[in-house]
Amino acid sequence: MHNETSKRKIPIFPEITSSKDLIAYLDSSERLNKRKYLYHYTTIRNAIAIFKSGTWHLGNPRDMNDVVEYRNGDQQRWNNIFFASFMAENKESIAMWSMYSQPWKDGVKIAIPMSTMKEWLKGIDEILEVSPTNYELTGKSIPVNERNTIHISSVAYSNTASCDSSGDSETLMWSNQKNTKIPNCQQLSELTGYIKDNAWDYEKEVRLKAEFENTFGYSRVAVKIPNSILNEITISSGPLFEGDLLQRMEYELNRSFHTDQSFFAG
């Protein structure tokens, strides 16, 4: 499905007029060609869990912090979408530290080279069910194929909510580009999972998505992340991280790591 759209000639972002072309544009790996890394802001506890389990969990949108996006999306489509969020912006973000790496004393940032991310995606062959109560694997899974997909997609940002009161024209934004040719984009069911309000545009979000017909009623899933990929990850301590990051990680996992620290650390 996503490979087919990537082969079509896609208009430049300002000239896109259809949901189909917008989805193809945001799903295209070309959007990330200039990005060296994708970043995931989290806590040391979650980072350790990823390394211990050799899996990366993808949550259901019902549990995300943007209730406006969930409300605007199609509820049936949401049932079939799971994702983990990354930031495509190389510049370090205090806003992201504040939102996702709390408490401050435990905040870390995971950096995955873009080439490593693409290699990881190619090797994922199944989607694993995760228990919503204890977050452990249930032993159930579905294969990755044309119907059950794993891919990365960018998020576009809309000013629909704010333009109603300000009188501005409705505008969709991705990176530094603007589009005014897809009206009411946040209300289009087929764009569920692709559009957020521009209040969130500082996140420069890229999503690792699993999409499938959720006939089994999965509420949380995971994908395997092998050691060859984990070995390429760099973990940075946050601005107010307490203790020695490398010592804390090695104590828990008994392995070596690539580590760094926040630009804003004292």
Residue positions per predicted region:
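NAD-dependent ADP-ribosyltransferases
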Residues: 1-266
